[in-house]
Amino acid sequence: MRVVSVNLGRIREVPWRGRLVRSGIWKEPATGRVRVGSLGLEGDEQADRAVHGGAQKAVYLYPLEHYPAWREELGMPELGWGAFGENLTCEGLLETDVHIGDRLRVGTAEVVITQPRMPCSKLGMKFGDARMIRKFLASRRSGFYASVALDGDVAAGDVITLLGRNPAAPTVRDVVDEQA
């Protein structure tokens, strides 16, 4: 398991459905090491902290394994890392294998998986299609949020290590299936 890309974004104001909407969903790959703290990654911004960010959603991880299917389904062969607003594009961490409560070492930081990402209107706005929210949920390719148990730093190429798991805890996919 490893980090393929660390992605950061600044808040933008974007016209959507007749009004200006603020969002930090547009993420770009960062270079070098990035500090990870209790409220997220240094240099990353969220416009609506009631829905995104905060201690329980400090870091959003998304499997790179989902990108080929999205590129084909959306007709976007150049879809790049961070496209879904994730902070960490990761390899080897799938919703069917990751459990709520899993503790992971990512770079020098430690995170605890808290919940799946449930899509919001900002995802539809980013892709210019409100139906994207429904497509994302139906795909069950949600990615997942984590809280930060130990501050540290992370960079592309860092190994991800499972430090602890409660095997009785549901997988991220189990939770998505219950909510979908």
Model region roles, listed by residue range:
Residues 126-138:
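Short beta-strand-turn/beta-hairpin segments enriched in glycine/proline and small hydrophobics
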